[in-house]
């Protein structure tokens, strides 16, 4: 159930170049039951910046009423958010959207989780949920360069974790697909979140696999009212059929929407 709440900053730190880990506390956490959902953050008081920022939920601790989100500080809004200190309040709307279907993976199966850049964070909560139900997890994390790699060790605690960097400064040189090819990775179900180029590459390979992708889109309202984040359906690529990433997604079965 979506709610709005002023949540307390428990901790915030930079964990890689311009990548921040923000932990917030509040009873809203009790509504966060679906990995892959996101929250809409009002980054500052007043009207500037006007629009909220959508940020994925990385980790949920309902016993402490705390959740963690990771984000890249690159624009005015996220740079403002990066200045928030312990004890301050943050206006949070959420949880929003439809997340990853954990129930589609069965105990004893192997799930491949592929993340690219700031698409990596929502896979962490997903991985924990899968491990808890007896699913073997393999992670492939793609980044541009070593300076922006994060959470490699945390994912490795849950299952095999491979890193690819475009410039080869850490892990396998190249893209996430190069890791799959190099290690001959096989799996029963795929979950992925990241840039469109990466998602397209995975879709081209695994149309016949059970697979789910999470889209990263700029959003206005976050609740399906403004139509700023619509995407066409593959069965009607130039027609009037569409899905809204914020409310129908951000997670879709592979092959459903036009990437």
Swiss-Prot record:
Q: How is the cofactor bound?
A: Binds 1 [2Fe-2S] cluster per subunit. Binds 1 FAD per subunit.
| UniProt entry keywords in alphabetical sequence | 2Fe-2S, Electron transport, FAD, Flavoprotein, Iron, Iron-sulfur, Metal-binding, Pyrimidine biosynthesis, Transport
Query: Where exactly are the transmembrane stretches of this chain?
Result: none
Select a single GO molecular function from the record's annotations and give it: 2 iron, 2 sulfur cluster binding
Q: Which cofactor does it need?
A: [2Fe-2S] cluster; FAD
State where FAD binds.
Answer: 53-56, 70-72, 77-78
Where in this chain does the record put each FAD-binding FR-type domain? 2-102
One family name in Pfam for this protein: NAD_binding_1
Instruction: Report which residue ranges the record marks as coiled coil.
Output: none
Q: What does the record give as its pathway?
A: Pyrimidine metabolism; UMP biosynthesis via de novo pathway; orotate from (S)-dihydroorotate (NAD(+) route): step 1/1
A GO BP term, please? 'de novo' UMP biosynthetic process
The answer to keyword Flavoprotein applying to this record is: yes
Residues given in the record as [2Fe-2S] cluster binding sites? 221, 226, 229, 246
Q: What does this protein do?
A: Responsible for channeling the electrons from the oxidation of dihydroorotate from the FMN redox center in the PyrD type B subunit to the ultimate electron acceptor NAD(+).
PANTHER family hit by this protein = DIHYDROOROTATE DEHYDROGENASE B (NAD(+)), ELECTRON TRANSFER SUBUNIT, DIHYDROOROTATE DEHYDROGENASE B (NAD(+)), ELECTRON TRANSFER SUBUNIT-RELATED
What is known about its subunit structure? Answer: Heterotetramer of 2 PyrK and 2 PyrD type B subunits.
Name the family the entry cites: Belongs to the PyrK family.
Q: What's this protein's name?
A: Dihydroorotate dehydrogenase B (NAD(+)), electron transfer subunit
From which organism does this entry originate? Bacillus thuringiensis (strain Al Hakam)
**Lineage of the native species?**
Bacteria, Bacillati, Bacillota, Bacilli, Bacillales
Q: Which gene encodes it?
A: pyrK
């Amino acid at each position: 159930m979506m709610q709005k709440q002023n949540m307390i900053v428990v901790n915030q730190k930079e964990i890689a170049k311009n990548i921040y880990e923000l932990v917030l506390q509040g009873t809203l956490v009790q509504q966060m039951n679906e990995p892959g959902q996101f929250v809409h953050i009002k980054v500052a008081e007043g009207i500037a910046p006007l629009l909220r920022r959508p940020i994925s939920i990385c980790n949920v601790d309902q016993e402490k009423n705390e959740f963690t989100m990771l984000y890249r500080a690159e624009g005015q809004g996220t740079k403002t958010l990066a200045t928030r200190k312990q004890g301050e309040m943050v206006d949070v709307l959420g949880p929003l959207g439809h997340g990853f279907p954990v129930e589609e993976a069965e105990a004893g199966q192997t799930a491949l989780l592929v993340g690219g850049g700031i698409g990596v964070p929502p896979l962490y909560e997903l991985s924990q949920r899968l491990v808890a139900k007896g699913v073997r997890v393999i992670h492939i994390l793609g980044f541009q360069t070593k300076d922006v790699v994060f959470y490699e060790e945390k994912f490795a605690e849950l299952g095999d974790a491979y890193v690819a960097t475009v410039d080869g400064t850490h892990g396998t040189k190249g893209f996430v697909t190069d890791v799959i090819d190099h290690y001959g990775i096989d799996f029963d179900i795929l979950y992925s979140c990241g840039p469109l180029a990466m998602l397209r590459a995975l879709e081209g390979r695994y149309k016949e696999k059970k697979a789910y992708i999470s889209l990263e889109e700029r959003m206005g309202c976050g609740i399906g009212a403004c139509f700023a984040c619509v995407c066409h359906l593959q069965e009607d690529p130039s027609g009037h059929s569409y899905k809204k990433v914020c409310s129908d997604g951000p997670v879709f079965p592979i092959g459903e929407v036009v990437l």
